Design a protein with these regions (language model features):
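Predominant activation on well-ordered alpha-helical scaffold segments within soluble catalytic domains
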Residues: 51-56, 120-127, 170-173, 205-213
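Short alpha-helical scaffold segments that flank and stabilize functional sites
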Residues: 9, 13, 125-126, 210, ...
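Glycine-rich, anion-gripping cofactor-binding loops and their flanking helix/strand elements
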Residues: 1-6, 144-174, 196-205, 212
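Short coil/turn connectors at secondary-structure junctions
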Residues: 12-15, 31-32, 102-105, 129-132, ...
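Glycine-rich phosphate-binding loops that contact phosphosugars or nucleotide phosphates
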Residues: 1-69, 74, 78, 159-189
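Phosphate-moiety recognition in structured ligand-binding domains
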Residues: 174-235
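Active-site phosphate/pyrophosphate-binding segments
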Residues: 36, 40-46, 50, 56-139, ...
Length: 235
């Protein structure tokens, strides 16, 4: 509903619009000047890839830079890396999910380009799909409040990238580890196979999905079950 209204308002204001959707029969497809129908089930990865393609092409035209070419080159390597993560991370995700299932809540911490993924996993996935109470914290703001709750029994999930913000997230992680052992870390340096730092949201997404899937199952909760979402209750 909100996306359709946004497209209508954008067109009314004279903006050129592109509707990005998994299926051409989606209502938003009729509202865009152009449609990108990606036809894939993994919508978060697909949305990221489309967004990166738009931004890369725009920047190449208005402000060419060698770093843009590095990102574009590494995008072609991404399918192979993701396939290996899908095949190789299930058991690790199962073990981590079982561990986290004993915690009543979970704080997700990240910085830089991983902050949107931290929101997606720490808010959307944990709350909607696993019914786990939690919050998403910006590592850059960790010392301004969140550090006060670090103590034994308080669990944290950290996402570490390889960009310039790594120092900020690592500093928060080091502090937390001095006060609690209930910490899980997903690190692009360990799983990203050397891909560009700005592709970290795409690589970390796969292990996090395995983790959240098994977290839900170990809590005896069907991740597809909803009480209110999708028109089940008035909102």
């Amino acid at each position: 509903e909100e996306v359709c209204l946004a497209l209508e308002k954008a067109k009314a204001a004279g903006a050129y619009t592109v509707a990005v959707t998994g299926r051409e029969e989606n209502p938003i497809a009729a509202l865009g000047d152009r449609v990108v129908a990606y036809g894939a089930e993994c919508i978060w990865e697909a949305h990221l890839l489309v967004a990166y393609a738009f931004v890369l092409e725009f920047l190449r035209r208005v402000a060419p830079h060698p770093e843009l070419e590095r990102i574009a080159a590494d995008l072609t390597k991404l399918p192979g890396v993701l396939a290996r993560l899908v095949a190789g991370w299930e058991e690790k995700g199962r073990a981590l999910g079982e561990r986290a299932s004993r915690w009543p809540f979970l704080y997700t911490v990240a910085a830089g380009p991983l902050k949107p993924l931290a929101y997606k996993e720490g808010i959307v996935t944990l709350l909607e799909f696993t019914w786990t109470h939690g919050s998403c914290l910006d590592a850059a703001e960790f010392r301004h409040g969140p550090l006060e709750v670090a103590e034994p029994g308080v669990p944290f999930l950290f996402l570490l990238g390889t960009d310039e913000s790594r120092h900020t997230a690592q500093r928060a992680l080091d502090f937390v580890r001095r006060h609690t052992d209930d910490v899980i870390v997903f690190d692009h340096r360990e799983i990203g196979e050397g891909l560009h730092p700005w592709l970290a949201p795409m690589t970390l997404f796969v292990p996090l999905e395995w983790f959240c899937y098994y977290l839900s199952l170990h809590k005896d909760h069907n991740p597809d079950h909803r009480r209110y979402y999708g028109g089940l209750a008035e909102y």
